[in-house]
């Protein structure tokens, strides 16, 4: 029964996982912190009044 012989496919399985775990995580981690949150000030700014020229 050839499906019980791990010789032909086991090396391919190990090599594909090695390639996957070597190249994919750095590409994913590069885009992980794309939008870092910024700190906001606690003091409220006073809004400027609008100038309504048509009233």
Swiss-Prot record:
InterPro entries: ATP8_metazoa, ATPase_protein_8. The keyword Transmembrane helix applies. Keywords: ATP synthesis, CF(0), Hydrogen ion transport, Ion transport, Membrane, Mitochondrion, Transmembrane, Transmembrane helix, Transport. One of its GO terms (biological process) is proton motive force-driven ATP synthesis. It is a single-pass membrane protein. Pfam families: ATP-synt_8. It is found in: Mitochondrion membrane. Its main location: mitochondrion. One of its GO terms (cellular component) is proton-transporting ATP synthase complex. The chain crosses the membrane at residues 9-29. The keyword Electron transport does not apply. GO terms for molecular function: proton transmembrane transporter activity. Residues 35-55 are annotated as: Disordered. F-type ATPases have 2 components, CF(1) - the catalytic core - and CF(0) - the membrane proton channel. PANTHER family: ATP SYNTHASE PROTEIN 8. Belongs to the ATPase protein 8 family. Mitochondrial membrane ATP synthase (F(1)F(0) ATP synthase or Complex V) produces ATP from ADP in the presence of a proton gradient across the membrane which is generated by electron transport complexes of the respiratory chain. F-type ATPases consist of two structural domains, F(1) - containing the extramembraneous catalytic core and F(0) - containing the membrane proton channel, linked together by a central stalk and a peripheral stalk. During catalysis, ATP synthesis in the catalytic domain of F(1) is coupled via a rotary mechanism of the central stalk subunits to proton translocation. This is ATP synthase protein 8. It comes from Xenopus laevis.
